[in-house]
């Protein structure tokens, strides 16, 4: 970690922003935190925040399809690594209801032993009903599932215990549950990380616009407000006429996506001063 931070910091003077990629948790949390402290340009770990923004946008539109209310939703996130923790923190910041984090050992609860720093931090602000148990227990009565974990962990029977479930199975190349299986279990909206299924949830929709907007106004950091504004702008690109259970996000190839996200980020930066 020390060498990585030192090297990036030394070359940072030559660049307008730093996009971190493929740094595993928990190292990524410390690397990003320390770089933000020593660099005067935006530092953005795409695997964390890019993924979180596009998931938030997808959830906003899945809510429009299902009629669910943000503050009343129970959202289960499986995979408490870089992406999962960032998704949980952003959704909590946006006002989504009860976020329940799960890892290989099941539901994460405040006071659990063996948590890394990122998991420990989110344990204090998630799982407000102090649930315990396995992933199947967490999904009972849940409104949404967000998977950033491993293939084939979720069954149709587990989905059937959800409430008009929103299922984002984003493990690649094989998702936590295949879309047809999730729908067989009664899922109302299904998304994956793959382009060969409807509703691809991919951070490629986010990071080009994030940096374009930040660089345009010479922002020194990517704030929580910018991330939220980007998620809302991305969601708003899908009109009421276009919106359906199989179309909750614009195509990653839509040329308007980057400019829309950039405009939202720049506007938020100006308003924040």
Residues covered by each model-derived region:
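Electropositive phosphate-/nucleotide-binding environments in soluble metabolic enzymes
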Residues: 1-5, 25-29, 49, 53, ...
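Rossmann-like adenosine-cofactor binding region
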Residues: 121-188, 194-196
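Glycine-rich phosphate/diphosphate-binding loop of Rossmann-like nucleotide-binding domains
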Residues: 45, 49, 53-146, 150
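Glycine/serine-rich phosphate-binding loop and adjoining beta1-alpha1 elements at the start
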Residues: 1-73, 262
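Adenosine-phosphate binding glycine-rich loop
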Residues: 46-47, 66, 171-272
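General beta-strand structural signal in soluble alpha/beta enzymes
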Residues: 19-22, 43-46, 77, 101, ...
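Short, ordered loop/turn segments at secondary-structure junctions
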Residues: 22-25, 46-49, 104-107, 150-151, ...
């Amino acid at each position: 970690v020390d060498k990585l931070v030192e090297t990036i910091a030394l070359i940072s003077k030559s660049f307008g922003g730093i996009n971190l990629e493929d740094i595993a948790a928990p190292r990524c949390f410390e690397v990003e935190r320390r770089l933000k402290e020593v660099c005067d340009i935006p530092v953005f770990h795409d695997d964390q925040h890019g993924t979180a923004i596009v998931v938030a946008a997808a959830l906003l539109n899945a809510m429009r399809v299902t009629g669910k209310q943000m503050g009343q939703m129970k959202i289960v996130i499986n995979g408490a690594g870089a992406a999962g923790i960032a998704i949980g923190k952003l959704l909590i910041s946006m006002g989504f209801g009860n976020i329940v984090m799960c890892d290989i050992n099941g539901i994460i609860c405040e006071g659990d032993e063996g948590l890394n720093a990122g998991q420990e931090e989110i344990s204090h602000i998630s799982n407000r009903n102090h649930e315990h148990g396995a992933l199947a227990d967490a999904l009972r009565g849940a409104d949404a599932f967000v998977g950033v974990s491993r293939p084939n962990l979720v069954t149709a029977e587990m989905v059937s215990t959800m409430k008009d479930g929103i299922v984002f199975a984003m493990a690649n190349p094989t998702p936590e549950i295949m879309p047809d299986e999730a729908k067989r279990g009664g899922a109302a909206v299904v998304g994956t990380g793959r382009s060969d299924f409807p509703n691809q949830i991919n951070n490629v929709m986010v990071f080009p616009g994030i940096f374009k907007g930040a660089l345009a106004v010479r922002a020194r950091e990517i704030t929580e407000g910018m991330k939220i504004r980007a998620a809302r702008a991305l969601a708003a690109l899908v009109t009421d006429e276009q919106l359906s259970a199989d179309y909750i996000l614009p195509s990653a190839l839509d040329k308007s996506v980057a400019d829309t996200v950039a405009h939202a980020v720049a506007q938020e930066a100006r308003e924040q001063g």
